[in-house]
From Swiss-Prot:
Known role: SOCS family proteins form part of a classical negative feedback system that regulates cytokine signal transduction. SOCS3 is involved in negative regulation of cytokines that signal through the JAK/STAT pathway. Inhibits cytokine signal transduction by binding to tyrosine kinase receptors including IL6ST/gp130, LIF, erythropoietin, insulin, IL12, GCSF and leptin receptors. Binding to JAK2 inhibits its kinase activity and regulates IL6 signaling. Suppresses fetal liver erythropoiesis. Regulates onset and maintenance of allergic responses mediated by T-helper type 2 cells.
Record key words, sorted: Growth regulation, Phosphoprotein, SH2 domain, Signal transduction inhibitor, Ubl conjugation pathway
Quaternary organization: Interacts with multiple activated proteins of the tyrosine kinase signaling pathway including IGF1 receptor, insulin receptor and JAK2. Binding to JAK2 is mediated through the KIR and SH2 domains to a phosphorylated tyrosine residue within the JAK2 JH1 domain. Binds specific activated tyrosine residues of the leptin, EPO, IL12, GSCF and gp130 receptors. Interaction with CSNK1E stabilizes SOCS3 protein. Component of the probable ECS(SOSC3) E3 ubiquitin-protein ligase complex which contains CUL5, RNF7/RBX2, Elongin BC complex and SOCS3. Interacts with CUL5, RNF7, ELOB and ELOC.
Pathway membership, UniProt: Protein modification; protein ubiquitination
Post-translational modification note: Phosphorylated on tyrosine residues after stimulation by the cytokines, IL-2, EPO or IGF1.
UniProt keyword Phosphoprotein present: yes
InterPro entries registered for this protein in UniProt: SH2, SH2_dom_sf, SOCS3_SH2, SOCS3_SOCS_box, SOCS_box, SOCS_box-like_dom_sf
GO molecular function: cytokine receptor binding
Chain residue ranges for the region called Extended SH2 subdomain (ESS): 34-45
Domain commentary: The ESS and SH2 domains are required for JAK phosphotyrosine binding. Further interaction with the KIR domain is necessary for signal and kinase inhibition.
Boundaries of every SOCS box domain copy: 181-228
Protein name: Suppressor of cytokine signaling 3
UniProt gene name: SOCS3
Source organism per UniProt: Bos taurus
Amino acid sequence: MVTHSKFPAAGMSRPLDTSLRLKTFSSKSEYQLVVNAVRKLQESGFYWSTVTGGEANLLLSAEPAGTFLIRDSSDQRHFFTLSVKTQSGTKNLRIQCEGGSFSLQSDPRSTQPVPRFDCVLKLVHHYMPAAGAPSFSQPPAEPSSSPSSEVPEQPPAQPLSGNPPRRAYYIYSGGEKIPLVLSRPLSSNVATLQHLCRKTVNGHLDSYEKVTQLPGPIREFLDQYDAPL
């Protein structure tokens, strides 16, 4: 197997710290999965690439709870980390890449299934409140029955009238049980008007059939970034 370095985000002038950002790909398909993930993350506007956990803590320190960003993991076993501001400060959740999908890091003691996705953006979208996170226009990946993570699923809360039930997720850290809330990404750059329009369109395409009715060039443009966030 070949060890590949991480991918620096566009516009990042700081050199890559190869002592911390190397990981072995298990297969060509995993390599392609990560390459596609990096491409979409770079377009998302909230991928902070090589910032460290300490730097992420500083970036999020003045932000309200629920603000989050994606960065490269300092753990050589993982590619990405989700850093989120919680009621108890900034928490860092590793994103696992296994079996052709991404998930939050597993807790071996849990028996709950872990939501798994073929895209990091879909993973993030899954943990965002339904009211503030429009649906993806593409069919979701099949979930896996793997053990749950540091953010285990809980029984669904009683839904409000007209709203579907939604599971609650928690972070277990230092003996604390902290609600996981992803409400707003922390932007690393100014988005182009073209990208903002694409996100808006994605958020209003609530069915795959609507996508297939669009002209080919527009479908291709939307496919390059199929997230509403």
